[in-house]
Amino acid sequence: MKRIYLLSLWLLACLVLPMKGQAVSQADLLNAEQFEHIDSSADSGRGDGKYLDLSSVKPLTAPNGHRRIEAVIYVSMPAANMIQGLSVQYDYQMNRSLRHLINAHDQALKQGNKIPYISIWRTKQGNSGITGTVNAGGTYYNNGQNRQQRIYAENLKAMILPAEFGDEKYKLPNLLYQKAYGIAYDDET
């Protein structure tokens, strides 16, 4: 029984549930009123990259000390005639924001602890305080028609997860946080 349970968990990690919602085309993604292009060093400048559906950014209820945000991200790959839509949710631990860690470090210094400032950076790199999950996904052709193709967990890791501090994938959840709450996650106390 345990083996069946572990096998089913492994299969879920490889597959993403179908995304509910509208298919989008490459032309739709270029509508700056509805979608925001998220700059990336991997972009070629030919319409590829990540796009945030601005109407999908929603704060969710979360346990004390956390904040949660849900949004839809589209990853455009025009050369492959493919757009992947991902419904994502990010959980933010408020005690892991950079401002909170700096304040805690300064408090420790006042109490006589001689901890170097680089420890803040190392602490943040060890745990960014942001956990992302993909709730659903869909794949489309550049013209917006549905494409029957699965989204695999290893592709998600390359595109958006995990949100590691100092990594380009850290930019997306911070942008979502700022859109939802009007302040950068790392500026929260």
Task: Label the model's feature ranges.
Residues 2, 17, 22-23:
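Amphipathic/hydrophobic helical signal segments and adjacent flexible N-terminal regions
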